[in-house]
Amino acid sequence: MRMQAALVGWACTTLCLASCSSAFSHGASTVACDDMQPKHIQAQPQHQDSHHITIHTHRTSYAPGDKIPVTVRSSRDFMGFLLQARRVSDHQIAGTFVLIPPHSKLMTCFQEADAVTHSDKSLKRNLSFVWKAPAQPVGDIKFLLSVVQSYFVYWARIESSVVSQQTHSSAHSDDRMEPRLLMPNLHQRLGDVEGAAPAPRTPITLPQQHTHVFAVALPGAAEEDNLDPVPASIWVTKFPGDAETLSQPSSHTATEGSINQQPSGDSNPTLEPSLEVHRLERLVALKRVSSESFASSLSTHHRTQDDPSFDSLETCLSSDGGEQDKTKASNRTVTQPPLSTVQLTYPQCLWSSETFTGNGVRASNPIPVLQTSGTSGLPAAGDQSEASRASASFLPQSKHKELRAGKGNGEGGVGYPRQTNPRPDIGLEGAQAPLGIQLRTPQLGILLCLSATLGMALAAGLRYLHTQYCHQQTEVSFSEPASDAVARSNSGETVHVRKIGENSFVLVQAEYNWITPSVGSKKTVL
């Protein structure tokens, strides 16, 4: 009877262990979704500070619908795990997992694929997941992980760093807009600006990109315009229709110079939302003053388009009649407060991508040059009407020459400045080259002499060795008149000499066997 009871108890224990082992090897149960505790053992979890597992989130903030990569790294192998994303506010499960590693499967705790667990008991160490945020805002979240290293060793609810939700203001913190500068498009007419000026718009949000522009001054520009360097960090505001506007990131004001631009029918006029009335009045006054100059530039532009000889250079010439009007308009310009005033206007003339330099030589790929400067006073009316010209201008320049407005007589012409050569002087390098060669000549001569001496010594040594060991002499003395004679050379070789005439001998080198005759005389047998 006792034997049967023991067998029944053993069978029940085996079945319980098998069921628990099966549940452990095929993943966590849905019962563990709430507290994330393994249900197959009753042991206490390990201390949170003793675990060797880290949860890395590749982003610190997210927006609704974003996908966040999550990586679980461990210095030791483990078999089971349960991963969830929970809200920091109420600890509710949030989001779904869209990508899971091998040997794992998705779970459904409160919604489909909102948790991940293991699918087998294979050893695991590094796992990668992709979590997708819900479409509705849920606030800041954390990733919680429970890991089972062995049957009795596990860690529950290991937390990751907080992933904050992006708000509307923080999402656009890098693209905040500070429009403070009225800047028409490069190809925009002043008449279009005048027509759109009386209708101010409501404040709108425009994306901006922060850029750093290097200030490059043309030769002689500092003497002509009395330019002062200012910070070249500006904002580029993008408007609809691929239009861009430059503005200063701080609260700097801008003054407009005399603008003479080419017309373009595909450019839409754009105005800054924060526009003062007096700036509009000044812009309209500048338009009226430069109307004749604009007409002259327009006629010149059409003339150069019709004439194929001027298809690569657009010349912008201002008329003589508008010279005094420009001077008066510049004198009527309202003085701004001394707040590090910045002038950012556009150039008076725009050249095409190819210009003629020299005697018809075509120079392509012009480089735009930006000038930034600050002026604190009004330009004086003198011999030049271009004293109030733009201090920040994009001027195309070729590889060898630069084009800038001509001087004198108050007439805005196009001139060719002196040629600048950024490369070092080649003549100086050529003058220094023979000096280096002269310094190295004695060393080269000494090296050649030593080489010749060594070669001669080597040749003499080889000749001596050849004489000693290669040329062997054999001396034979014929003291007795005999037809045949045997002699031994100085090298120990035995030779046979045969007399074939009165003064003729034949030297034969051979091997001989000496035979002692019975008579007492020696005879050589060949």
UniProtKB/Swiss-Prot annotation:
Q: Where is the signal peptide?
A: 1-23
Extracellular topology: which positions? 24-443
Those parts of the protein on the Cytoplasmic side are 463-526
Transmembrane segments annotated in the record for this chain: 444-462
Query: Which portions of the chain have biased composition (kind: Polar residues)?
Result: 245-271, 385-396
User: Which keywords belong to this entry?
Assistant: Membrane, Signal, Transmembrane, Transmembrane helix
What is its subcellular localisation? Membrane
Membrane topology annotation: Single-pass membrane protein
**Gene this chain is encoded by:** REELD1
Where does this chain mainly localize? membrane
PROSITE patterns (alphabetical): REELIN (PS51019)
Please identify the protein, giving its name as recorded. Answer: Reelin domain-containing protein 1
Domain (Reelin): give its ranges: 24-179
Q: Has the keyword Membrane been applied to this entry?
A: yes
- Write down the superkingdom of origin: Eukaryota
Q: Does the keyword Cytoplasm apply?
A: no
Q: Which InterPro entries match?
A: Ferric-chelate_Red/DefProt, Reeler_dom, Reeler_sf
* Gene Ontology CC entries for this record: membrane
Show the segment(s) annotated as Disordered. Answer: 242-272, 294-336, 370-398
